[in-house]
Design a protein with these regions (language model features):
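Short amphipathic alpha-helix that is part of the acyltransferase structural core
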Residues: 1-26
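Short loop/turn motifs at secondary-structure junctions and domain boundaries
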Residues: 27-31
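Conserved beta-strand in the GNAT
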Residues: 38, 43-52, 56-64, 94
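A short, internal acetyl-CoA/4′-phosphopantetheine-binding micro-motif in the GNAT/acyltransferase core
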Residues: 63-70, 98
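Conserved acetyl-CoA pyrophosphate-binding loop and the N-cap/start of the following alpha-helix
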Residues: 69, 73-81
């Protein structure tokens, strides 16, 4: 499974993004200024949006895993990849995700 950054047509991942944040308005807001990463096999498995919050802080705004892949370590793998991405550039990786029922069960 590969993780790659998506720079165009980010809204095509909206169904997965809505698993991590039920408010499409909020998704639009941070998707515009953030970076979208997708884990994909044959189809998208997980998405993650990160934003530069300044002062050396990278924040995970949205993290969602397709329900067919829950409890398989996918979310952890995405977080690990974001930590690797942040290393050497940011001093803090913080998680600022919504409180949808699916998100809360992950935490």
């Amino acid at each position: 499974m590969d993780i790659f950054e998506v720079t165009e047509k980010k809204k095509q991942y909206l169904p997965l993004l809505l698993l991590g944040d039920e408010q499409e308005e909020m998704i639009d807001r941070y998707l515009e200024r953030g970076r979208l990463f997708v884990m994909q096999s044959e189809s998208p498995i997980a998405v993650c949006v990160v934003t530069d919050e300044g002062d050396g802080v990278l924040e995970i705004k949205n993290l969602a895993v397709h329900s067919d892949f829950w409890r398989q370590g996918i979310g952890r793998a995405v977080i690990d990849e974001m930590a690797n991405h942040a290393r050497g550039v940011y001093h803090t990786l913080q998680i600022g995700i919504g409180d949808s029922p699916a998100t809360m069960s992950f935490l």
